[in-house]
Each structure stands twice: as structure tokens, then as C-alpha cells.
Amino acid sequence: MKHAILSALFLLAASPMIPAEKPSWRQATDAELASLLPARAPVVKEHIETELRTASGIVNGHGRYIAGIVLITAGYSADGKYSHYLVVQAPIRIGGVPLKPGEYVFGYTHSGDVLTVHFNEASTGALVGTADAHLIAGSSRVASLRIWPPGEKALIQIGRFGIPYELSEK
């Protein structure tokens, strides 16, 4: 009995030394995305309609999401500036652009085999950074937005183009 108690105490004392397992990421379900993403996204001073069937995202074991959805911008001042709304609940670097937890919008300009994607804060419209999306090699289905889990591709797909991303521990 003493031996069992001593063993238990040792394991409790040693547990902070055992590194915590990194939370694994998986594709978010349609129901999860519907409960997370707004039907009307707050963009600067407007609430712009979104299209739920275009939603895509990933979620980790702690319930933190990286998710996005297409904006229906026709008739709004954002028309031509932004095409997608993005919710970030864990730090991420997309094509070299660091995004801390928050809400963002992004749009792009198309030039040949490259999309130049500009990321902006959703609440202010302030530019956070730009990144290039390149044609995805091989045959890939075209998607208005797809956020691939990091175990598969670590890629944000816009149409036939992709931007690599890295999740941050901080």
C-alpha cells in the first residue's frame, strides 16, 4: 500500500515534466461551422451576408477554430475589396502573414498564376498583410474556400489556388 501511494505521489510530482501533447486539428463539421460563423459578418460598419454552403474550417482538441466563409458583397461598400470572412481562435501564419486570434476579411487580385491575397481586420478594415497564393499542383477540386487540416496539407485553398499556413503554439 505504501509503495502504491509513493508511486502515485511520484507520478503527480513528475507530471509537469511530461510535455503536453499538441492539440490535434481536424476538419470542422457543417454543424460546428454553422454555429460559429455569422449569417451576416461584421465588416467595418456593415453586416455583410455570408453563404453558409461555402464555409470551411478546422478545429483543435481544445475547441479552437480557424474557419472562413464567402461574403456576398454585391451592394455593399466592401464589394471588390473583400471576398471572405475569417475567424481565427488560435495564432496562425498564413503565407507569412501572422494572424492573432480575431476576425478578419480577405480579398485578392488575380494576375496570371498568382493570387495576391490581402488580409484585413474585419472591424476596422486595416491591412494586416499580403501573401501570394499559387496554383495547386496536380488535380484538386475547385473550392471557393477550403481550409485543409495541417496533417493533410496545411493549406488554405481559394478556387484552384493555395496558400500554406503554419499554426503557432503561442
Q: Where are the regions a protein language model picked out?
A:
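Sec-dependent N-terminal signal peptides
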Residues: 4-13
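Primarily secretory-pathway and cell-envelope proteins
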Residues: 18-76, 126-170
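Mid-length scaffold segments of soluble, non-membrane domains
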Residues: 73-124
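Generic detection of intrinsically disordered/low-complexity segments and helix-coil linkers/edges
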Residues: 4-5, 19, 98
